Amino acid sequence: DVEADNLLEDATRIHCLSYTSDGKNYQTIFDYQEMRDFILIQKGLIGHNIVRYDVPLLEKILGIKVKARLFDTLPMSWVLNYERAGNKHGLAAFGEDFGVPKPEIDDWENLNPEDYAHRCVEDVKINWLLWRNLLKRFLYIYNNDKKLLDKFFRYLEFKISCAASAELTGWKLDVGLARQCVDTLTTRKADKVVELKTVMPKRKVTTVKTKPKVCFKLDGSVSSHGDRWFNLLDEHKLPRHYDGEVTVVKGWDEPNPNSSDQVKDWLYSLGWKPCTFKYNKNKETGEENKVPQVRKNGELVESVKLLIKIDPAVAVLEGLTILQHRLSIFQGFLDCERDGYVKAEIDGLTNTLRFKHKKPLVNLPGVDKPWGEEVRGCLIAPEGYTLCGADMTSLEDTTKRHYMQPYDPAYVLEMSQDGFDPHLDLAKHAGRISQSDIDNYNQGTRPDIKSLRKNFKVVNYSATYGVGAPKLSRETGMNVREAQALLDAYWERNWSVKAFAEAQ
């Protein structure tokens, strides 16, 4: 483990380097030349985020090139500890688990070297325990086949080194275009808010009235306070002896399109039936709270879009939603920009070992979406360079075919033919479209099938991981019966997926 005076980009000094080779004896180095001599003779180094921080830092400050094999316990934890929250993969969190508290330090420039060394050693202690824990579990998964496990570790090292290289290189940002888009969208957003205020219902402002202490004068006649109270009861058709609270309308405020509650109240008044929810689980009680969602991934959910037919004013909300989302992207570019570049950082791995990305380069709209060309256009190549990209076709589906082949070779052969679309094939198998419809779609004469394909794509991928009808219903907006029908069609067609899973 290494402690420095700042994060990688701004670090100018390494305070110390601590290490152990047996989990019992811990050493700390303060001298730069001793660090060089130590690092350059190592065949393997184990560290937490060592690929993306410690090694780049050592190479930057010491002017060396580390050639040792790198075993990074951070991505290893992402792989095995997939149920841990994103912020629970750090050494501080594991220190709590292992009973080795991570020392806190707020000043990274002026403390004694021993203070930094103490923290550094404790980090090494925590990481030693984490490494032993991870290694034991990996060996169990790989049936103690160390050669096979080493292949996986090499792959993981390569993958994270690619991420480290991307983060170090950065992505050149067209700052001028980003600022121009922020200015334009800010103006348009304000206009949309004003427009939406004219179509949303005004908000009722209420106050609570209570019975006055004195309703009658000494002579028995009604007091002025009593008179107002009894008139209020008459207005609300309440008996004169009523002495509870009365809610009255105080006035009407202009609607606030930025208020989630007010927007939802408006949609409910139009007959909105939510289909997309966010589920918040109470950690203490285990109870799940279902929160209706108006937006998802920067767009209105399908159940809200349906209301445009009932009230075209909902289209204004759709426009505002897109503007807000795109504005946040461009603003994120500018917030994260440094010397004309933004970082393509990662924040974890999915269960298929894909990267989870961090702001600002995450979930960017395609060029076929509103403002997609401008968003992508902000990411440019330096002078003399060309941007290029590569992707694998149907990575998960291809992996699935590999395991299905021994059980259902005929279906795998069919899926391997040029032009085969697993999502449209499932739609055909479910009776939603015909082969001629698919042919017309491929020829560009049935673009309307694209939305249908999108739903069946969700089914194809989520069903493989055991999704149930209720959750699929929430994800697609269809009812539970329709979702179950699609799942039935999927498993009838992909029975071999269960077969090879059960055989493991």
What are these regions (language model features)?
Residues 14-16, 60-62, 269-274, 359-365, ...:
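Short secondary-structure boundary/capping segments
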Residues 8, 12-15, 19, 23-32, ...:
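Active-site-proximal helix-loop-helix substrate-binding element of RNase H-like nuclease domains
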Residues 440-453:
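Short, Lys/Arg-enriched anionic-surface-contact patches
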Residues 2-9, 51, 392-399:
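Short acidic, Gly/Ser-rich segments with clustered Asp/Glu that frequently serve as metal-coordination loops
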